[in-house]
């Protein structure tokens, strides 16, 4: 039994009282939400006209085109390119937008777009809008920029931890989050996938950088994503920022500057001017680019100042293909009967249905992997049918959500026993920070130990079925994505794209991950061939404290909460 020492009693009482008072707080009831929708006719925009021209020239009846985005740099520059190219509308829907260097460059580009008359709508889940990241909300007070927060918490934004503690009285609201990730320009070209917005998603964090996958989408599928955005934007759970917080209150939350002992030259360098845009070359062959860059002294893939602002999207390998959007309705997050009725009609359910069609090979990438009994049965059925199943997920050391790993370990031995090939991503990628890229892998180190200048964490969510069907989206294979969060994904039926995705992912299995095997009842982590690393009999690169924490959490944490 815990005891409260006398000297801490008053502080504890104040804390509990504050939490209770915050729990009694409520959201505004009289909120004005002007209805708005995506651009109805984009034929008068350069992006719309370009997509139409490409569609007319394509020798296919498919109405959507796609290009995979594996590298962190391309993920940044493609978004910047769309911002700068937009003439009418920009719609952004994200779970998290961090206030840092890469997003400040995006914000400046968004302000410039708004100044030239582009309508900018930003829909952001409210969970991560505390502390430093609350400064993102300042965009809501710019002309031509509208920002709404989805499923907001009526609690302080002083810090993320305090938001969680002070929202425990409404745990159901706290758990249900909008996890969708959509970026659409002029209702013509879109980006969706696993990435949120921030340094850690664009290879610019001095700590951990996420390895992720997005897909650029043009044509009809972009319009589908826009319709999904509109459904969330005009939903009663979307609150205009101005109805929740004032510009003055946001300014008051700004972190006080701290004098640094030393300043990295990379971080202090002025932003590089926008490079001259490459001219399109009709004879340029379609190739999947290889992205592998050396780490600088700060541990970054490239200096922020050196990141280009744009890329020529015309030079990417675009493929016209049959596709469909998988998306949860906003009512999934609402606490009502409709949501309960739709609990078996989710993005994850659609994904599982597609996975069940596998005949020969299933490749799964899921950073947070807590399958639960239903998914375990599906994996067992696939293995009984002779389907090869490979799963890439995070190791304990690379996982930024220890609780999720605690849920995963309950199923790991069972998966391996049924013949699923399990790979866990290495946290330390010696000497390099790598993105998914054809032939690049996930940091194939040059021997020695697994200690290096950079740390990586898997964040990509993708599935390849029989090398003919590719699914990329925001969902994880866990019960949180199935039951708690709203998600979005694109399923693309095309052998070329599925093969490209496989070529992006497979080097990560062989060079950037441990193969986990079960030998005589003992788990063995097989180090990548040629890495110079030893095999391990316990979670590699993880501290003893972290391993003990997982053992404590694992038997008790419910799957649907992880």
What does each model-found stretch correspond to?
Residues 2, 6, 21-181, 185-562:
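Charged, low-complexity intrinsically disordered terminal segments
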Residues 11-22:
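Bacterial N-terminal signal peptides
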